[in-house]
Amino acid sequence: MMLLQRPKSYPDESLESFFIRVANKNGYNDVHWFLVAVKRYLLDIDPRKFQTFPTDICCINPYSSKKHSISRTHALHHLSQLTFNEPVDLLGIALNRNQMQFSPSTTALIRGAEVIPRSLLRKGAIPCCPCCLGEHGYASYRWHFSGYEYCHEHNVKLIERCSCGAIYDYRYAGLSGVCTECGENISASQENHEPKATRIASWLAGDDVKPLPDVPLSYRWGFMHWWSQISSSCKTRNNGEFLAFWEHWPNSFHKLIGKEIDFNFEYCVLSKNDLRVKDILGKILFSSIQLPDRNFRSNIILKEMFQYIETHLWDDNGKLANLRMNMLEICVLLNCSREQVTSMIEQGLLPPNRQLGKREILIVTEYAFYLGDVYCLWLSEFQSDEFNRSFYLSRW
């Protein structure tokens, strides 16, 4: 297979956009038929390895593979040679699966060095910025993720419909910006301009935007994911509240935690002695741990969560300290294994809240520990260079 035109990829370009540009430059108006030709070429090289190579542009990223993405990664290596691109450049704009997780249990995607929660990946049509298509001729990967609702460069809302009402998804309609239904150029609406949404988009693009935190990009996406979890909303759209939250940080977070605790204590169905961490703090605590990791330097949400717990642990006769935990929750909180927890019990470092039989083995789901004991264990044994008390008590 010979490609006469070999465009280079752009750093913020989506993989789908790059394939569309390569197809168009080499005489294919429809990227589907280009992918059919590419698959035929790959099958001639190795029929078994490339049998699952997709001809649907929406499935071209390695993460889309149902079982594993190795064959698609190999395919991208071959295509980088065809287009005279360095493999690292082409693989760098692809969305891959990643072993990291965003709390409480969201898988991660990785693009270059940027880790993004899969929960933010759009499932329907991908909106676009008509100005970007007209000026740059390619699509940004950020358009694929909710939270990025406005183009930070042109200050216009991303659109997914032409003024005629037809859906415009660049993956199928192309990068020309021309509606396939009415033949007119799509245009950005100047109405309902939201400066706050534009500021969030600029922040997600890497700009320093006050009052939003100056943290690495992966954490910015993580904080958007976290906000969608704790605000009980399917979409991270309340831009005013999100900005106000950071405007008054960290008091806004302490107030949010206190409100959650008071509400859960007031409406709990269990007796006070049987209350668990997940009943009172679970929603906020366990959604804050991996964003995408627990490094206090950048995961300032988790840092403030621990600050709040330490400050209020023994308030009201230890109502937080006496919350119950099970072994699985301890593993999450301390970032350790069940075997380590078992060893700490045997050494007397972590006392259960009841007397164990001589050869009794605790069930991992039994709420046999107190938060106060677990927190004190963290203080004495489990602090690390990036996950330690000095980050929020440096004045000492």
Predicted region positions:
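Basic, alpha-helical nucleic-acid-binding regions used in initiation and control of genome expression
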Residues: 1-396
